[in-house]
Design a protein with these regions (language model features):
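Short, flexible helix-loop junctions that flank or precede catalytic/ligand sites
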Residues: 1-169
Length: 169
């Protein structure tokens, strides 16, 4: 996951202009400035905690925000808010498939917030990438199995209606 996120940040850094902010615990890859200004914040070193880092992120006028791992509802709230304000938000979440990732996101929130959440996801989600390392036939290594789900009118409609299991079909 970390290597894939680092590759996405590096691609953006090489092929676009702007400001990339990473919030990590710990910083795993150092990104030098290329076409973008890259500000890397390590929780506990550069910022007191996740909450403080996330709260101060928009003050730095980023174009891209890498949030590391989403572990709780508060962090997910920030990710959605960043996406709603037009920022590209990259993060990881433990899940075995795109469907499971969407279910995990939904389950962070209480029932009374679900309809708004589904609408927000349907409008702001751009892609989900699910990765698993599987053993090779010879058992002498592992090979990645990658699922990429891009948002489309059909996916957005299924998410909006809460028909997440149908996405697999």
């Amino acid at each position: 996951k970390s290597t894939s996120l680092a590759a996405m940040v590096d691609h953006r850094n090489q092929n676009s202009y702007g400001h990339i902010i990473t919030i990590e615990d710990p910083v795993e890859f150092v990104h030098p400035h290329k076409n973008c200004i890259v500000t890397q914040r390590e929780v506990g070193l550069d910022t007191e905690d996740w909450e403080a880092a996330l709260k101060n992120t928009l003050r730095q006028a980023p174009d891209v925000i890498l949030m590391g791992e989403i572990r709780d509802r508060e962090t997910m709230d920030y990710a959605i808010a960043f996406a709603e304000t037009g920022h590209l938000c990259l993060a990881t979440l433990h899940a075995n498939s795109a469907n499971q990732a969407i279910d995990r996101i939904i389950n962070f929130f209480p029932e009374d917030r679900r309809q708004q959440l589904l609408m927000d996801l349907s409008l702001n989600l751009r892609a989900m990438v699910s990765q698993r390392l599987l053993p090779m036939k010879d058992r002498k290594g592992r090979v990645p199995a990658v699922e990429v789900m891009l948002n489309s009118p059909l996916i957005a409609d299924l998410v909006f209606k809460g028909n997440v299991p149908e996405i697999k079909d």
